[in-house]
Amino acid sequence: MFTTPIIAPVSADLIRQELTPDKLLRATNKGGNEIYVFHASTAPETMREIGRLREEAFRFYGGGTGRDCDVDEFDLADDGYRQLIVWDPAEGAILGGYRFMFGDEVQIDEATGRPRLATAELFEFSPRFLTDYLPVTIELGRSFVSLPYQSTRMGAKSLFALDNLWDGLGALTVLNPAMKYFYGKVTMYEDYDPHARNLILYFLDKHFPDPDHLVRPTDPLPIVVDEVEIRELFPTDDRLENYRALNKAVREIGLNIPPLVNAYMALSPEMRVFGTAINEDFGHVEETGILIAIDEIIPDKRVRHIETFDPDKAQSDLLWTNISRRVRLVKS
């Protein structure tokens, strides 16, 4: 779909020079990898490599920006997003990453009254969300796993890539205990079978609703289903039973439920889903908004990704400079 060539890989030596100890967040629980956090201004070459890997991964599935490198104003602004990456020190490669922003740092655009978030063009936020939720929410975006680590040829490294990323997200909640929620999106691509997509979206809307109407898509993607089929497919209100039926139905179409959809559902049974918008500027991908309460993450995930983190070993100056102030405020 896109013809602009993606930039060449950035030298691993340049990235190593930028991934200094002050950016190290933690070691991963599995795979022998490391997690770093930084702003683009402090690691510009690493930011270029992130942009290359993001564009490569998103284009592979039919999304992407169409530019030679997926880096935008939200990455580069002085008050913009921070990057969280998993680094494989043995291979000298980035496995994957997120960009994130703490909600109490989000600026409100005076002209529009909207928060300066990457999702603000796709979703409308209720006054209650802006007042009661956003200040205690970590907004997540641009989740990716590098293409080489999506294949089994990388062995255990591939298996643990997403798990490693959640080690990083878990550490953020320990370092900034004022944060109570994760807000972000799951993506399905334009070429994903519409029938399978609608079954998945119906299931999410049924079992992970937003009764308070906190967030809604600016231009919602309609969920078109056959009522007779739905009654037969989901005859009860039992979430696990209906999930098994959904998984079977999607497999019969020849597909799998997207991994991130499965992964987020497994994090918390109380997840909220906010509907789906089409991102016209990103290859017409379908973006579904979600909210997960940190204290509702299931116990085994909390133990694995949150309780294993020792904040006394965190070295990231960028985090400590900003978070220690908040911790003092919470305690006072």
What function would you assign to each model-found segment?
Residues 2-41:
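Conserved N-terminal entry element of GNAT/NAT acetyltransferase domains
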Residues 259-266, 271-292:
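Aromatic sugar-binding interfaces of carbohydrate-active proteins
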Residues 39-42, 88-90, 99-104, 142-144, ...:
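Short, flexible loop/turn elements at secondary-structure junctions
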Residues 27-72, 83-102:
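Short amphipathic alpha-helix that is part of the acyltransferase structural core
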Residues 287-332:
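C-terminal non-catalytic accessory extensions
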Residues 63-71, 77-81, 101, 111-128:
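Short acidic (Asp/Glu) patches
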Residues 74-85, 108, 271-272, 282-288, ...:
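A short helix-loop-beta-strand connector motif used in the catalytic cores of GNAT acetyltransferases and
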Residues 105-271:
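Acyl-donor binding region in acyl/amide transferases
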